[in-house]
Amino acid sequence: MSDKEQTSGNTDLENAPAGYYSSHDNDVNGVAEDERPSHDSLGKIYTGGDNNEYIYIGRQKFLKSDLYQAFGGTLNPGLAPAPVHKFANPAPLGLSAFALTTFVLSMFNARAQGITVPNVVVGCAMFYGGLVQLIAGIWEIALENTFGGTALCSYGGFWLSFAAIYIPWFGILEAYEDNESDLNNALGFYLLGWAIFTFGLTVCTMKSTVMFFLLFFLLALTFLLLSIGHFANRLGVTRAGGVLGVVVAFIAWYNAYAGVATKQNSYVLARPFPLPSTERVIF
């Protein structure tokens, strides 16, 4: 192998610096590969090897087959090495819990069938959207997926806190019993905070896939519409947020299905479509 290994045609790709460490640094005879030119290029992505079989991310080296691509089914927003721990993928469980609870509440917000009292969602929010999603998020952290763990644990906490609002034992609604205006403003700020948080996560998905990005972008808009609906006391805006929430629920189910369906168990697979900004990635 020459001192300058082959790189892709991407103009951002240059030769990687020396000092990489990987379990794949030695060939079958135990001979180390040639060192790469030493210049600073941390944070860039490179290809190397006779057939471009290696990926260099920062100062780490991986086989292409060892890397996870951006994929909604695993809640990985970008290239990531395979986790050290060997657990099943918890993302579909967390996404399913989020999707079903969002679907139920959003149908209530949209006033489907004339329903105005959302208390039926409390049980779902406590145990499926809350507890189960929180457990899935903790498992994501164990699998070294910071984004997935942050998202699932946070939205699990959202559903638990939302359920607490409608549980009389907490006394939250009772405190606003004589002041509906304060209740609407308080719920508006509550939902606005979640909108801001979700917009932050959306920025972290802009190099992933279309359905992955849409999940968080539309969810942020849903929170924003619901927040505005409470601030302005406009039922029409709240209903619009409910309709958009139903769309978000189906996108979450799609991403969950993408993480469950494989060639071994299904004839119908969910194909990831990368966003335009990721078409230059070297895979």
From Swiss-Prot:
Main location: membrane
GO cellular component: mitochondrion; plasma membrane; vacuolar membrane
Compartment(s) where it occurs, according to its Swiss-Prot or TrEMBL record: Cell membrane; Vacuole membrane
Keywords: Ammonia transport, Cell membrane, Ion transport, Meiosis, Membrane, Transmembrane, Transmembrane helix, Transport, Vacuole
Protein topology in the membrane: Multi-pass membrane protein
Regions of this protein lying in the Extracellular compartment: 111-120, 173-185, 230-240
Membrane side Cytoplasmic: residue ranges: 1-89, 142-151, 207-208, 262-283
TM stretches of this protein: 90-110, 121-141, 152-172, 186-206, 209-229, 241-261
Induction data: During meiosis and by external ammonia.
One example of a Gene Ontology biological process annotation: ammonium transmembrane transport
Chain positions covered by the region annotation Disordered: 1-41
PROSITE patterns: GPR1_FUN34_YAAH
MF-aspect GO terms: acetate transmembrane transporter activity; ammonium channel activity
Record family assignment: Belongs to the acetate uptake transporter (AceTr) (TC 2.A.96) family.
Function: Transporter protein required for ammonia export and acetate uptake and resistance. Necessary for up-regulation and down-regulation of meiotic plaque (MP) component levels in a dependency on external acetate. Has a role in ascus formation.
Descriptive protein name: Accumulation of dyads protein 2
Organism: Saccharomyces cerevisiae (strain ATCC 204508 / S288c)
